[in-house]
Amino acid sequence: MSIRIIPQDELGSSEKRTADYIPPLLFPRLKNLYNRRAERLRELAENNPLGDFLRFAALIAHAQEVVLYDHPLQIDLTARIKEANDQGKPPLDIHVLPRDKHWHTLLQSLIAELKPEMSGPALAVIENLEKASALELEEMASALFAADFALVSSDKAPFIWAALSLYWAQMASLIPGKARAEYGEARQFCPVCGSMPVTSMVQIGTTQGLRYLHCNLCETEWHVVRIKCSNCEQTRDLNYWSLENENAAVKAESCGDCGTYLKILYQEKDPKVEAVADDLATLVLDAHMEQEGFARSSINPFLFPGEGE
């Protein structure tokens, strides 16, 4: 199954929801999203060997919350959604969508928020980014979107991505179209922007028991059935790993067919789990999966591969 985003004026009366309707897409709800992430990161930092790193990520997430409201985005995406639908492409495709300088403004504001909180190497990194030319920023953004991580140092990447993510999340939250599921391929990528997931989550509430993958860029969530590899869609050789026991709130779902894994979070086990924060706080599980011979099929926005990785 792939998910296409259909413009409002192309939705017919047949689109009415039934009792068993499963929302294929959950567009980002930005109110308090970054504050919740920052709070969860700070909570998970307690008694965690990665505590300093989690608190560092919390500072960035909190800055994102501030900058989000300081620099709102107003844009009409109706024409873009129609064009993308006609082409069968994600409306905010990271590989083709022209980037507005709005994200440069977001980056500079993030840096201004973070400078008083940073010291040492981290401060040097953001001061270096503050002086970067527009061309240099665009080159780094293009390299990250092309997964050419050797061209962007792993200490700069989280700050660049934080600004890009804010920009894409702002756009995604403004999409006036609705989504419907259609058969196709490439459901391992976000149907809104084409980026990859950070984790998947089995939810509670109105989407009780349903699994959604969470985009590491635009914060959209999209439905993928459980007991299926989110990377290759095979079902025959899946296994679930955890650091605790079978009731753990965070597990890794591995696939023997494609040799990858993606973490799966369970809100019914812990309602406070957060896609980015809980992934970052369980890097020990990633190390274990690597020892077992599996490759991660996702990237956390605070942890990018460095040169040679």
UniProtKB/Swiss-Prot annotation:
SUPFAM superfamilies named among the record's database cross-references: FdhE-like
GO BP annotations listed: protein maturation
Highest taxon in the source lineage: Bacteria
Predominant cellular place of this UniProt entry's protein: cytoplasm
Localization terms from the record: Cytoplasm
Keywords: Cytoplasm
GO MF annotations in UniProt: ferric iron binding
Signal sequence residues: none
Homology family: Belongs to the FdhE family.
Matching HAMAP family: FdeH
Purpose: Necessary for formate dehydrogenase activity.
Official protein name in the record: Protein FdhE homolog
Species this chain originates from: Enterobacter sp. (strain 638)
Chain's gene name: fdhE
